[in-house]
């Protein structure tokens, strides 16, 4: 009987630890890395398909209460710029600046290029 009790505690402890969840990531990376990789490889995936994948990723992340990673909105803005959607481009760049203030100089630079303010 005395051997049974410690064994039971050990087994129940192992079962409970097996049910524990792993650490949560800071950002929802979902499809973002794959989309960027395809874009950099010059994959035949169209810009619209990349935008759709990133927008879906953003919706899923917000539904789960997770944040998208740094560069997400900047990349989405650059995809919008390729389609000539200036309002969406600016909105994404501003969102990137707001969420990640350290990106402000680069986002300002990209917005100034769009306006033709750089030489």
Language-model segments: residues:
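Structural register within alpha-helical repeat arrays
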Residues: 75-76
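Residue signature of alpha-solenoid helical repeat architecture, marking inter-repeat boundaries
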Residues: 25-29, 67
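C-terminal motif of bacterial Sec signal peptides marking the signal peptidase cleavage site
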Residues: 15-18
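Bacterial signal peptide processing site
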Residues: 20-23
